[in-house]
Amino acid sequence: MCDILKHTTMKTGDKIMKKIHRTLSLFTVAAMCTALLCSCGEVPDSSQTDSSSKAATTTTADTTADTTTTGEASSTASATSAPDSSVSDSSSAVTDDTKTNGITPAMWKVTSPEGNTMVMLGSFHALKDECYPLPEAVTNAYNNADILAVECDITSTSEDGEYMKNLMKQMLYNDNTKLSQHISEEAYSALQTYLGYWGMDISALEVYRPWAVSSTLDTLLIQDSDFDTEKGLDNFLLTTAHADGKEIYEVESVDFQMNMLINFSDDIYDLMFRSFEGETKESQKQALEDLYTAWKSGDIETFLEEDNEEELAGYTEEDKKIAEDYNNQMLYDRNKNMAKAAEDLMSQGKNVFYVVGAAHYAGEGGIIDLLEKDGYTAERVQY
């Protein structure tokens, strides 16, 4: 359910499935799942987890920006403080209240072979109060764009009762089987131990399919932190764009992301759950914090650091094949589609602010690499 933090659920330094990236790339969908799980009473509140967790949220975020644009806010209200639920009731655009606010996420000005340009920004789907107001370069990129391109627009789907009802049905087994029958004893044991750190017993999740269990883990992590999906970059920009009447372009869709999570094989989730062995609440919170620190400074390569030989030693060849399948579906195949969408928009001369998860831009096979191989140039924005 979550897509999508690339799960911080990996062992420290264990990146075989690039799980932490999940957290960053599909958290949009995770927000809907969070709401569903909380409505079922399966996600413990702060009294159950001994934490000061925040209430579950229902939306997510991703973002990117440009370097040469300048512009004024398109409406009256100010973004001088972190966005809260009231932002959806305002008609405010993002405003230029600060230069960087100590936040300098990776952002590019991309130019096509024909000379058309686009501003691209790497987002983080759950952020903190300290991220607002947004950096001036980001606000300028938003204010000067005619179109906001995002992975998907969850703001309307999350309020669709029928859609959420159908999604809830897909979270549960309907064949009289249970979780322990679909994953290995090793994976089940690792999950059971990890959930204990959150004051949960795995028996509470036996009726849920692996993708719903995975999302529950992400939900627990976010709720017990300073992060909030409502303050995520995508969610903030989407809410603002709707209020401003700005056109929104979905590179993917909520259905696409949900279907991907739902249809991952049991083998993928088994490997994912096994990676919780040795993990604790604190180690996962620190892993998420480390990713956030990297995002703040524009260090996107950290999201895709490779395993060394020692880290890979504990994995079988079959595990490595499963991890490769996961990474292709979660990251590299989507990168190709995202790059193609960007090229199509630029070929039409559209004035677009293109905001997707930061990990999608990183390294070989990332969006920037794919665009450059097709003859596009990408200039990193200097704040």
List each model region and its residues.
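N-terminal low-complexity, Pro/Thr/Ser-rich intrinsically disordered segments
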Residues: 70-110
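Bacterial lipoprotein signal-peptidase II cleavage site
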Residues: 38-65
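Extracellular/periplasmic catalytic domains that process cell-envelope and extracellular macromolecules
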Residues: 101, 112-113, 346-348
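A cross-kingdom marker for long, charged
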Residues: 319-383
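Sec-dependent N-terminal signal peptides of Gram-positive bacterial secreted proteins and lipoproteins
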Residues: 19-44
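Structured, acidic catalytic/metal-binding patches in enzyme active sites
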Residues: 95, 106-326, 330
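Phosphate-group recognition and catalysis centered on beta-loop-alpha active-site segments
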Residues: 47-48, 54, 76, 87-93, ...
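Short, Lys/Arg-enriched N-terminal segments with co-localized hydrophobic residues
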Residues: 1-16
